[in-house]
Amino acid sequence: MTAQLIDGNALAKQLRTEAAQRAAALTARGHQPGLAVILVGDDPASQVYVRNKIKACEDNGFLSIFDRYPADLTEADLLGRIDALNRDPRIHGILVQLPLPKHIDSHKVLEAIAPEKDVDGFHVANAGALMTGAPLFRPCTPYGCMKMLESIDYPVRGARAVVVGASNIVGKPMAMLLLQAGATVTICNSKTRDLAAHTREADIVVAAVGRRNIITADMVKPGAVVIDVGMNRDDAGKLCGDVDFAGVRDVAGHITPVPGGVGPMTITMLLINTLEAAERAAEDAALAA
């Protein structure tokens, strides 16, 4: 068996085309979707991520504001800028690129973003809403993973899903979205005993640890869907995920590649979250008129 690839680039292109059409309709009504991205410091990976986000906005008819600050920016100044963006009617989404310098409290910064503009879905109000099944925003990476499952018409209801990784950014919200879709979900973490015993029983495996080859072929149930969220480098410096792609591909039914899998979907769902925020703002403006 050779797994079918879930092509994140192709799916992202389709969803971005739809988002661009919705953005154009909003812009025609005077409500162009707007995203503000804040980068503090000069982390090379962060610069690449931010550049890709800004380009995605520009390519799809979104207003984008890029605020770049030196690493010695004070926490107070950053909070002041976020407050200004919270009050800016042109901006519907605010994203602070992580990680932040050590002297800045990331939690305090993320909580300063107005929940209705928290397009990453990290604010405690949005995380809590996700728990209740009525999220204002779904975190971008898990949201993209769910769209990938949807794209192959996978019957999530009743499936056994294992999420490897328990971060607030991917693992926990991924588990919640799968649970809400009707899956029976297990979350594995660094303390999990016999990881393979869990993954071998799974119909869906989501790997989100940031450790190369943590999922190998002998750990995967034949025919399972394997979604690789990891972003690592192999010994030759080539981009790779958390999954031993060459081996697992011969066992799984569907698999996402790295690169070209979850990555493009994450930025796409950021656009969609921003678009949905703009649509809500337009509705509120119409009601207030």
Swiss-Prot record:
Keywords tagged on the record: Amino-acid biosynthesis, Histidine biosynthesis, Hydrolase, Methionine biosynthesis, Multifunctional enzyme, NADP, One-carbon metabolism, Oxidoreductase, Purine biosynthesis
Enzyme Commission identifier(s): 1.5.1.5, 3.5.4.9
Entries under CDD domains matching the protein: NAD_bind_m-THF_DH_Cyclohyd
Residues that coordinate or bind NADP(+): G165, A166, S167, S190
UniProt catalytic activity: (6R)-5,10-methylene-5,6,7,8-tetrahydrofolate + NADP(+) = (6R)-5,10-methenyltetrahydrofolate + NADPH; (6R)-5,10-methenyltetrahydrofolate + H2O = (6R)-10-formyltetrahydrofolate + H(+)
Biological processes, Gene Ontology terms: L-histidine biosynthetic process; methionine biosynthetic process; purine nucleotide biosynthetic process; tetrahydrofolate interconversion
InterPro entries found in the cross-reference section: Aminoacid_DH-like_N_sf (IPR046346), NAD(P)-bd_dom_sf (IPR036291), THF_DH/CycHdrlase (IPR000672), THF_DH/CycHdrlase_cat_dom (IPR020630), THF_DH/CycHdrlase_CS (IPR020867), THF_DH/CycHdrlase_NAD-bd_dom (IPR020631)
Biological function: Catalyzes the oxidation of 5,10-methylenetetrahydrofolate to 5,10-methenyltetrahydrofolate and then the hydrolysis of 5,10-methenyltetrahydrofolate to 10-formyltetrahydrofolate.
NCBIfam families with a match to the protein in the record: PRK10792.1 (NF008058), PRK14186.1 (NF010783), PRK14189.1 (NF010786)
Quaternary assembly: Homodimer.
The protein's name in its UniProt record: Bifunctional protein FolD
The organism of origin for this protein: Ralstonia nicotianae (strain ATCC BAA-1114 / GMI1000)
